Amino acid sequence: MSARAFRKFAPLFDRVLVQRFEAETKSKGGIMLPEKAKGKVLEATVVAHGPGVKNEKGEVVPVCVTVGDKVFLPEYGGTKVVLEDTEYFLFRESDILAKFEK
């Protein structure tokens, strides 16, 4: 995705924009998988995030993920966003289940 598209789209508050990994098209044995057998991809890469949310004291608490982090998502949820013919999903930070350590 080009940087120009991200300048036009900036998540607010604790929202995180992710791009899901591509579903496997072959099994480990090399058999081509039909579309229905692929399953839902629950892993994604963070491509943008908002600044965070304010706490009771009015201080902004930053999000705990950064651009490039690999995260684990719930099976359902998120808002689908299409930017420059590429599909992304927008989640609240609290909806993200886990972050893979580097």
Swiss-Prot record:
Its main location: mitochondrion. One of its GO terms (cellular component) is mitochondrial matrix. InterPro entries: Chaperonin_GroES, Chaperonin_GroES_sf, Chaprnonin_Cpn10_CS, GroES-like_sf. One of its GO terms (molecular function) is protein folding chaperone. Signal peptide: none annotated. SUPFAM superfamilies: GroES-like. It comes from the Eukaryota. Keywords: Chaperone, Mitochondrion. It is found in: Mitochondrion matrix. GO terms for biological process: chaperone cofactor-dependent protein refolding. Eukaryotic CPN10 homolog which is essential for mitochondrial protein biogenesis, together with CPN60. Binds to CPN60 in the presence of Mg-ATP and suppresses the ATPase activity of the latter. Homohexamer. Belongs to the GroES chaperonin family. This is 10 kDa heat shock protein, mitochondrial. The lineage of its organism: Eukaryota, Metazoa, Spiralia, Lophotrochozoa, Platyhelminthes.
